[in-house]
Amino acid sequence: MSQVCQVTGKRPVVGNNRSHARNATRRRFLPNLQSHRFWVESEKRWVKLRISTKGMRIIDKNGIDTVLADLRGRGVKV
């Protein structure tokens, strides 16, 4: 399963672990993704999204209908 937020588009970024001796080893910083079901009252159905916690805050602020319309406008199947 890909580590990409469906709402914000957040994806893993790469960086370094740093030891006390400042040795660098490559690592991935993963987004805080959650699988969450939202009830869409206008469609009378549940929609399951894989979104970051920032995406959940966006849905809380703008509403699920607005976010779904934006996703469908970008061609995301929901």
Swiss-Prot record:
Alphabetized GO MF terms: structural constituent of ribosome
Protein name, entry field: Large ribosomal subunit protein bL28
Lineage start: Bacteria, Pseudomonadati, Pseudomonadota, Gammaproteobacteria, Alteromonadales
Region (Disordered): 1-20
Transmembrane segments: none
UniProt-listed InterPro entries: Ribosomal_bL28 (IPR026569), Ribosomal_bL28/bL31-like_sf (IPR034704), Ribosomal_bL28_bact-type (IPR001383), Ribosomal_bL28_sf (IPR037147)
Any one biological process term the GO annotation gives: translation
Gene3D superfamilies hit by this protein: Ribosomal protein L28/L24 (2.30.170.40)
Similarity comment: family membership: Belongs to the bacterial ribosomal protein bL28 family.
Gene source species: Idiomarina loihiensis (strain ATCC BAA-735 / DSM 15497 / L2-TR)
Gene Ontology CC: cytosolic large ribosomal subunit
UniProt keyword terms in alphabetical order: Ribonucleoprotein, Ribosomal protein
HAMAP family: Ribosomal_bL28 (MF_00373)
